[in-house]
Amino acid sequence: MLKLKVAIVGVSGAVGQEFLRVLDQRNFPMDELVLFGSSRSAGRVYTFRGKQYTVKELKHNDDFKGIDVAFVSAGGGTSKEFEKTITKHGTVMIDNSSAFRMDEDVPLVVPEVNPEDALNRPRGVIANPNCTTIQMVVALKAIENLSHIKRVHVSTYQAASGAGATAMAELVKQYEQLLKGEEPTVEKFAYQLAYNVIPHVDVFTENGYTKEEMKMYNETRKIMHSDIEVSATCVRVPVMRAHSESTWVETERPISVEEARKAFAEAEGVVLQDEPANKDYPMPLFVADHDPVYVGRIRKDISNPNGLTFWTVSDQIKKGAALNAVQIAEYLLKVGNIK
């Protein structure tokens, strides 16, 4: 089997570390690994498959010559600055930031939904969608295969880790401070997250939606090549890891609960967990660190014959970031399009 030379850019971050775990867990075929980071991260040593690798500082040079694929999770500014440095020698850049997602000449890919889009990448860049979008479209694809989805209303319940490792630490610290009767530290979120939910993820735009909510609208339409209408409300909740979403869809024809269950059960990347009578439904507590999108609480909309409601939970650092990117590379390798 063809083995690749792989780079990870931003390896010291939460997603960068997840790249290492996912590549190992999936036995990704590679014979060389190069790690890149900022000047602060340069010199750090990480172990992968029993070998130690030292982080190199990301610079404008020829370090990417000979590298087949680069998994990049270093922020949009870094991605934009180093795009040509990474791709100029033919490296496929799979980027986890929002920098290129809506660029017409950059494919936005979820392998369970639109893998072929990854083959058309004139700039050598493939964008990883936002974590909330990935989770939703994997589930939507199963319903879209039954009947065209006209519109979606979705509310998200997003874990603290979606804002980074320091956000998780702040949530833990807040609980500790409050239990001691101390004033909680509030730096990473607009308000105290402990014992609270915050209907505010990313910054607000002129139309009243946040950037996170608009990502779900714009990205879903691009990925699904659809005129689908999406209205999202994104909420931060005091959960450590794994996002949840309550999703309502309106389809062109009525879809029964039985049809939907069968479609989800057979869908790629989905696990059906829908036995409410036995208190069996997806929850972040049990989904964290798992690969699939879990779907449950499937029910007909009692006010709209063409409406269907369901609940999804997925690990946003895995499927919502690192795993999706690695699956893109696996697809390119499978069809012989990576080298």
Region locations from a protein language model:
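Charged docking surfaces used in two-component/phosphorelay signaling
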Residues: 70, 160-339
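N-terminal Rossmann-like NAD(P) cofactor-binding subdomain of oxidoreductases
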Residues: 1-193, 229, 293-294, 298-303, ...
